[in-house]
Amino acid sequence: MLIALVGLIFLLGGARLASLGGSWYFLLMGLATALAGVLIVLRRPAGALVYGVAFALTLVWALWDAGLEFWPLVSRLMLPAAFAVLVALAWPALRRSRALPTGRTAYGVATVLALAVVAGIGGMFVPHPPVAGNAGPGMTAVPPGSVQQNWSAYGNTDGGSRFAALDQINRSNGRPAAGSPGPTTPGEIANSDGNGAEDQLTPLQVGEKVFLCTPHNNLIALDASTGKQLWRREINATSSVWQRCRGLGYFDADAALPAPSVANPSPIAAVTVAQGANCRRRLFTNTIDGRLIAVDADTGAFCQGFGSNGQVDLKAGLGAAPDPFYQLTSPPLVAGTTVVGGRTRADDNVQTDMPGGVVRGSMWSPVRSAGLDPGNPHDRQAPAAGSSYVRSTPNVWAPMSYDAAMNTVFLPLGGPSTDLYGAERTALDHRYGASVLALDATTGAEKWVYQTVHNDLWDFDLPMQPSLIDFPNQDGSHTPAVVIGTKAGQIYVLDRATGKPLTEVREVPVKGSDIAHEQYAPTQPLSVGMPQIGTKHLTESDMWGATAMDQMLCRIAFKQMRYEGLYTAPGTDVSLSFPGSLGGMNWGGLSTDPVHDVVFANDMRLGLWVQMIPADTRKAEAAGGGEAVNTGMGAVPLKGTPYAVNKNRFLSALGIPCQAPPYGTLSAIDLKTRSIAWQVPVGTVQDTGPFGIKMHLPIPIGMPTLGGTLSTQGGLVFIAGTQDYYLRAFDSATGKELWKGRLPVGSQGGPITYVSHKTGKQYVVISAGGARQSPDRGDYVIAYSLPDAH
């Protein structure tokens, strides 16, 4: 009866799929399975024969449709194979019911099929890398004079390397144990429904102090070798949504200022902090309520010589900027003696009238700002009283980078509001949106701009800190470059001096949609000279499910949507964006290996369905009904435009992404060959599963990653930003997982590493407040080091 029921489901669903122009397999398999089930209920051996033939043809179809890819084959074959075992076991009884010889062949067939099912289940517990790694470069020892001393910037260096010249923990011994400083509980648990507080911190380390910030911008200093709290500064910034602090800035007045060395740089302005004055060493934080705050790194006291009691109001000059329309979640950038801050705008599909995306650099004392207003780039002065910076212009919400030799800041720009409707965008919006922008750090003057998406209608804003590398050329020389990953899965390598691509970028024709007066770009860039991560052009055969049934439902949903590839423009019908606005690659950024010319990228692969709803319809009225700002999913009003929008993740009935795994990977990109050296799935379903139910199974399917990576000269890449509760270390040469340490809750943070001057031990530190979408929350900071020798 069960077989007949499943056959009926396949028959009905298959008929719908076939009517949409999809595969006929499910209709035919449903017909055969239903017939077989009825015959088996009637105790007719012909039912087993019918199912046997159908299963044999299913094997042929599965190999034709999916090739030898493991997870697609599991989805197509596991349920039919399990039924085949039951049918084979029933064969003797069916024969006996007709007084026919039974034989023993059926039991042998059932045994073989059962072993195949068991082998398939066993295969779920081993990784299936999309690109297998070979023996890569060996370790290069850190020269004595090059040992890293501090992790004093968000990306370790001002250029966002996320690389540590440390090798005490290395690929031959890299199995550290949890120890001091942690677990430490800073006392602020980030409880969130996905739209509120999240711990997404990358700490700083300077000397014997580790610096933290909480989602409400409270600042904490810990002893780097014991984890003891040294001081705490309560800021208690508030906002109605999106509370997070991803990092901090640091400045030391006793450190020598860098001297720009390229031709014709502007000078770095000198600053003086009196001996004995507070804040000779200072921490900077942007806040979720729109302030830039400076405190003494030694004591936590506010810096009296900076702004008003160490605080600068970043909403000044913006015009109307009510909560939560102006927030800052990424760290300020200390560029020489200029502190540069961008801003996060509340979800850019809420309304057209939003605070502008001005980028400002604050000097020491008195506070003055030099900035770039993307709506008025030639005027770098603050607006006069009663006026404001141009509204709704492209913003910078991700971390920024700095090259001291050029005295240049590199900004990853977002888009103007709103994300999905561009009919009213200006020429300057088109110039700056979704671009890398290079500015003079002292004056704010523009040096160059390079755009990665034209008239962005997908929320493909640049999400990460640009990383500064020396890019290997074919002749063995190196060119100073900027490398950045995008939500669209592209990796761009740009000349640091000119902004011109160092690898091939091709403009490809793209289609528009049916939105009136939209300024559709006829072409979009693809960075074809570098690997593209997770950007496969989906077909019906790429649809997946935990079973063949939900795979069929995903196929039906896919065929009901308009999909034309990466740049499928939103319209009034339901369209699919893959990868969607979640990425691709996101704010965790790239990590680099400058010794071996490799970069490492983690990604997520989540499609979104999108539908623009004309404002004069009842559906649009429903879409404008008080949605929470910044959720980014569901119905969003697009106030000020002729449309509302409805969008959400492209998931199966079980809450699983509809395309085949992996859903998150870690990739090593060889800059010399400009190819993927290895790519492995990251994360298991141990702490999550269908409907949010934990499966408690370490199945390495590859889960969406959110958070950064850390590479070391010890030949390791660390990552913790998965849906399960682990910090992992991978061999940077092969992609093999060498170690994982269990965390009390998940982490969205970026790992850092340093050597304590007191203990001489290398620590890897991670902040763990809970994985995204996970109800398990905490406030842990955990350090790992090699066990003491006994």
Swiss-Prot record:
PROSITE patterns documented for this protein: BACTERIAL_PQQ_2
Region annotation (Disordered) ranges: 171-200
One example of a Gene Ontology biological process annotation: quinate metabolic process
Membrane disposition: Multi-pass membrane protein
Segments of skewed composition (Low complexity): 174-187
Reactions accelerated catalytically: L-quinate + a quinone = 3-dehydroquinate + a quinol
Molecular function via GO: quinate dehydrogenase (quinone) activity; quinone binding; quinoprotein glucose dehydrogenase activity
Annotated compartments: Cell membrane
SUPFAM superfamilies for this protein: Quinoprotein alcohol dehydrogenase-like
Cofactor(s) annotated in UniProt: pyrroloquinoline quinone
EC category name: oxidoreductase
Similarity comment text for this entry: Belongs to the bacterial PQQ dehydrogenase family.
Protein name according to UniProt: Probable quinate dehydrogenase (quinone)
Gene behind the chain: qumA
